[in-house]
Amino acid sequence: AAGRATVADFDGDGANELAIVSHNFLSIFESDFSVKWRSPSDDGSRRTSATAFDFEGDGDMEVVYRDETTLRIFDGITGAIKTSLSCGSGTRVEMPVIADVDADGEAEIICSCNNLGGAQRTVVFTSDQTPWLPTRKVWNSLHYAPTFINDDLTIPAQRQDKADIPRLDVY
């Protein structure tokens, strides 16, 4: 079993890649399904998922993933860990969320963190260095797509295909 797949152009080459989390690895696959890179994962549920966002505005997506012990931000091209923060969870069907929750014009990372039987909390992570790019203030569901919901949380009468909007072409 694996969590929900994340599809994005992680390396800016114009072709989408696929991020899948299994019991032991977060793996990024090229469009021909060859492995681009993989990183060890500690996910006993086998149901967590990664998120993609270009925090730096360089055209290359970062991969954000939290397993049972750690929230990590990976370079989408190489798989190098850019940031690693302690954030435990028993894991189930969950993934980090990217939204501008404090309306400061910068993206934040939101995820659940707990110590398996103790305090449970939702944690918001912000950039401590260069400001992150702006993003929407809305993330309404596990199956979020920017064109599925309006900023005021109403449902669009006619949805635009997000594949037609390059910056939003992340699934």
Task: Please report, for each region that a protein language model flagged, where it lies by residue.
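A structural motif specific to WD40 beta-propellers
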Residues: 36-37, 82-83
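Repeat-based blade/solenoid architectures
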Residues: 1-6, 40-51, 86-97, 145, ...
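Short loop/turn segments that connect beta-strands within beta-propeller blades
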Residues: 30-33, 76-78, 128-129
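Blade-level signature of beta-propeller repeat domains, shared across WD40, Kelch, NHL, RCC1
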Residues: 96-171
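Structural motif
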Residues: 24-30, 70-72, 117-126
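Loop/turn-rich, solvent-exposed surfaces of beta-rich toroidal or solenoidal domains
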Residues: 46-73, 91-98, 117
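Acidic/hydrophobic-patterned starts of short beta strands in beta-sheet-rich repeat architectures
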Residues: 12-21, 57-66, 103-112
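Beta-propeller blade termini
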Residues: 3-10, 48-56, 83, 94-103, ...
